[in-house]
């Protein structure tokens, strides 16, 4: 549901586990993939399966990434269609209480143990966007995260100042950092290195090409069956 206010939702989904342990709870994973996600994903602009009939969604992988204030998850989804094919999507996920929300775009109300709040796309939370920026600056590599942060030679900023979305969301989500850098988040995931990333990095670091935006950094998702 696009830009929906949290007050329009029905009662929250209730789970016994704490949010920090959500993806070790089989009940949460089952409800999240079916009852919660199916109604949400079909209305997103980046969802590429609108011409087909959704059969079911499966959580095939996940990782946890934390800031000083919050726990977030990166979730790899496999969307299966009745036409006998599937697509992979990446969703960064947050759970926020009402006073922590930076957005009115809600996935679903939820309750983990005694704590009520909302499941939201983590990219809508400034704390999460800052976390991505800081990890690129530090060029952090942590195999447990299944993420590889790379800082390019042309990236000189060391301090996060601001972030905002660029234009309408299409097949990807673009975020402007410090009014100077654009991070393009690809929602649909392919089991290979993204050609946009390869070309941009090659032109900047190998060819020193000046007529296109310089490559300044990247985030790669390391999957068991590919990149």
Regions found by a protein language model. Give the residues of each.
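Short, compositionally biased low-complexity segments
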Residues: 1-18, 100-113
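Short Lys/Arg-enriched alpha/beta "domain-start" segment
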Residues: 10-54
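Accessory nucleic-acid engagement/destabilization modules that flank
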Residues: 4-20, 54-57, 68-71, 157
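C-terminal low-complexity, glycine/proline- and small-hydrophobic-enriched intrinsically disordered tails
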Residues: 1, 49-66
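Conserved ATP-binding subdomain of kinase catalytic cores across diverse folds
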Residues: 61-227
């Amino acid at each position: 549901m696009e830009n929906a206010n949290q007050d329009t939702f029905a009662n929250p989904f209730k789970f016994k586990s704490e949010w920090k342990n959500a993806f070790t709870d089989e009940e949460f994973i089952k409800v999240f993939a079916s009852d919660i996600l199916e109604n949400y994903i079909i209305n997103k602009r980046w969802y590429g399966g609108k011409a087909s009939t959704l059969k079911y969604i499966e959580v095939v992988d996940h990782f946890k990434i934390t800031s000083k204030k919050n726990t977030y998850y990166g979730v790899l989804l496999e969307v299966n269609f009745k036409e006998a094919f599937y697509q992979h999507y990446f969703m960064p996920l947050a759970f926020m209480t009402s006073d922590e929300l930076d957005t009115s775009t809600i996935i679903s109300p939820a309750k983990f143990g005694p704590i009520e709040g909302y499941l939201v796309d983590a990219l809508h939370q400034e704390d999460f966007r800052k976390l991505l920026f800081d990890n690129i600056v530090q060029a952090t590599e942590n195999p447990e995260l299944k993420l590889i942060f790379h800082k390019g030679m042309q990236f000189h900023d060391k301090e996060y100042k601001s972030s905002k979305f660029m234009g309408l969301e299409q097949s990807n989500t673009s975020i402007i950092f410090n009014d100077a850098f654009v991070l393009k988040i690809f929602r649909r995931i392919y089991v290979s290195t993204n050609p946009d990333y390869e070309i941009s990095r090659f032109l900047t670091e190998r060819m020193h090409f000046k007529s296109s935006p310089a490559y300044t950094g990247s985030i790669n998702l390391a999957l068991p069956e590919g990149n």
